[in-house]
Amino acid sequence: FRTDGQELEIRQHDPYNRGLLWPQRFAVTLCGERDSVIRVNMTDTLFRMQLPFVPSRVLPNTDGRGYGVFVPDEPALHWLAAHWWEIEDDTARQSLLMVLYENYLAKHISADDWVNSLITGLPAEKNALVASTASGYLANVMREIAPANRAEVEARIYTMTQNHPLPSCRIQLMRLFMQNAISEPMVKKLYILWQQQSDKHLNRQDYTTLAYELAIRMPLESEQI
């Protein structure tokens, strides 16, 4: 995606250079003095369109109907990573979260920037489907973050397991937390949780899984566990 004044340019590229084309229709949101949605009918590798105004950013595939990796221009990508949770429409927010994930996989977003985007936006998410999607993405990126940032990330995830407004999200976050927490303070919290079995949302299998995880992380207490 590229804009030049009031002109929008979209290019489609086959990453394997097979000359394939994917005709498709999808919505694009133009942000600026007044947000506007346009419909794109992509029938060739290049699409150009005159816009009604000069947008501050262009957000691709906001209706979720398109397929493939949508790569916004750099300013739009940075804005999305810092503000995706502010998008009011649930469908657009879910679709653009997927756009961010695909750009993370394509190495356009670093693991640390991606995890920071997720743990910043997730506490505000009220839609169960979007929250579940964000939590799943968080589980995928946990092992990739820099060791120096690990303890802080784990602490912020633990906070969400205690106070996120959606019970389903709290459970999902707790399960990923049990599988991924390695910092000493957070492992101690998991040990206390296993001892007291105080989280009534977790079932017997969850606590059995937690026992196995703790036995690996706390080898000196493994026999007791």
Task: Report the location of each language-model feature.
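Non-catalytic accessory/interaction domains
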Residues: 1-225
